[in-house]
Amino acid sequence: MAGNQGNYRENPTRNEKKYKKANGQPRLKEKSSRAKSDNVCPYAKKCGGCDYQGVEYKEQLKTKQAYMKKLLKPFCFVEPIVGMKNPLYYRHKVHAAFDCTRRGQIVAGAYRKNTHDVVDIESCMIEEQESDEIIRDIKDMLRSFRIKTYDEDTGYGLLRHVLVRKGYATGQIMVVLVLASPILPSKNNFVKALRKKHPNITTVVLNVNDKRTSMVLGDRNITLYGKGFIEDKLCGCTFRISPGSFYQVNPVQTELLYEKAIHEAHLTGKERIIDAYCGTGTIGIIAAKNAGEVIGVELNRDAIRDAVTNAKRNDIRNIRFYNDDAGKFMVEMAQKGEKADVVIMDPPRTGSDEAFLSSVVKLSPERVVYVSCGPETLARDLKYLTKHGYAVKRATPYDCFPYTEHVETVVLLCR
């Protein structure tokens, strides 16, 4: 999701918490009068990750559009939401938690809503299908290789999670085995057996998470097969994806989202751009072709390493990356009297903070392009910016997560 940096706590597909209220704004809710959908998920009542299960896709879009219009009414006109032609199997990053029941049955899938009880899921209607097949086969292989699942309560066991990432344009597949120990019994034979079932796998990585924590990924990666990363293409550029780095999960909508963001920047080839919360550098690298200079700022170390590599991979020479907190970095820029023509900000769902927003005001860029994945925090941040000299020109919502309540939005603000 745009702006989510570093590690994460739970399955981002099925167990994300609902938006927190900001400035008294209503959160997005499912309408009681709704058209039924033919796409029925057998796990809906147990999993609870898809807020709009059983709702016709057109009705989902209508509800989200109405919500965004109401939320952003004080600021600007809201353009029609950009939906998907095919709203199924869109997630190209799939995470499964592993556990064992009291009867000894191995389960793999999503956390039951607001718990850490694992719901055993064979396939998910919003997840890339080959990724689900890989997870299913890993689950079936555990007993023959005598690999025990990790028990959060006791701290015993080995396999905690499996993360599968697949490049939409390249087809490259990365499998990340999250273990409580760096030692995987018969690791070579395990990888060989897995690749025999799925020869399309590009790389297999062992991630070590040996702490009593709800965080999914640990800090250490051991490559068991391949290069330890995959690549994908977006808007004509090639990007490296490592186990812990941020990369949008819906590539079809992401391309449209980023193209809109760069279009709203109105670049002529001379502008100095600040790409805040830049992740692996995707937006900044794509924009650099039409800009004078781009400065990318990101807190996640893995992501910033990938960003530097991505710039070199695409022969982009007018971009620099800094491993720093975006808010702190912008404050220091403002204190030094530095200027920027455009700020592109892509914060996490919690939105930005006042220190960052005040630094934007001090830098006084002519245009601010806000890429939001949290509507209510977006409204909160727009309220601050409009009080300090900016006018919101327009907002365009994108449905990057069909069957969930989440909405991404590109907003243009001008001095």
Predicted regions, residues:
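Rossmann-like S-adenosyl-L-methionine
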Residues: 2-31, 186-188, 192-415
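Nucleotide donor/acceptor-binding cores
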Residues: 92, 171-173, 270-271
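Short, aliphatic-rich beta-strand segments
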Residues: 99, 164, 171-180, 238-242, ...
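Short, acidic/hydrophobic/Gly-rich beta-strand patch recurrent on exposed beta strands
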Residues: 109-112, 176-178, 307
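Extended interfacial segments that mediate partner engagement and assembly in macromolecular machines
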Residues: 35-39, 49-149, 169, 184
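Accessory substrate-recognition/RNA-binding modules or partner subunits associated with SAM-dependent
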Residues: 120-122, 126, 131, 135, ...
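Short, solvent-exposed loop/turn elements at beta->coil junctions and helix N-caps
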Residues: 80-87, 152-153, 161, 165, ...
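N-terminal hydrophobic or amphipathic helices/low-complexity stretches enriched
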Residues: 27-41
